[in-house]
């Protein structure tokens, strides 16, 4: 008797949500340094940084999804643009044992949380290579960003509740 019966713990582990990172990559990267070399002179005040972060998800196959984290940074000093950095960093994820209602939060909270450190490094390297101090992004509250997306969706459709069905296409 080498076959052991399945225990409840075995069944629970088999049904636990699983997330696999299949790939991660720079989808699009742009760095503009329009005022160089004037903006690179020593002794100038640090530029003000405007930052925008967005997350989108789309189906890429059966139980496979592409999640794109987009970061736009615009640095300005005295009403002139110092640099513009735009990054779309993506991950290809495989989900298993994730219900329809939980899929969207998984894709828009957990997946970007996993790829964020890599996107941050790419952006820091790009700004450093533009002869500026590396732009080190603070950690992002992806759950808060997701809640803001839900609120925006609910406001855009008065009288209707947010999708909530986990359809990643709704995140686009």
UniProtKB/Swiss-Prot annotation:
<dbReference type="GO" id="GO:0051262">
    <property type="term" value="P:protein tetramerization"/>
</dbReference>
<keyword id="KW-0963">Cytoplasm</keyword>
<dbReference type="InterPro" id="IPR035958">
    <property type="entry name" value="SecB-like_sf"/>
</dbReference>
<keyword id="KW-0143">Chaperone</keyword>
<dbReference type="GO" id="GO:0051082">
    <property type="term" value="F:unfolded protein binding"/>
</dbReference>
<keyword id="KW-0813">Transport</keyword>
<dbReference type="Pfam" id="PF02556">
    <property type="entry name" value="SecB"/>
</dbReference>
<keyword id="KW-0653">Protein transport</keyword>
<protein>
    <recommendedName>
        <fullName>Protein-export protein SecB</fullName>
    </recommendedName>
</protein>
<comment type="subunit">
    <text>Homotetramer, a dimer of dimers. One homotetramer interacts with 1 SecA dimer.</text>
</comment>
<dbReference type="GO" id="GO:0006457">
    <property type="term" value="P:protein folding"/>
</dbReference>
<keyword id="KW-0811">Translocation</keyword>
<comment type="similarity">
    <text>Belongs to the SecB family.</text>
</comment>
<dbReference type="GO" id="GO:0015031">
    <property type="term" value="P:protein transport"/>
</dbReference>
<dbReference type="GO" id="GO:0005737">
    <property type="term" value="C:cytoplasm"/>
</dbReference>
<comment type="function">
    <text>One of the proteins required for the normal export of preproteins out of the cell cytoplasm. It is a molecular chaperone that binds to a subset of precursor proteins, maintaining them in a translocation-competent state. It also specifically binds to its receptor SecA.</text>
</comment>
<dbReference type="InterPro" id="IPR003708">
    <property type="entry name" value="SecB"/>
</dbReference>
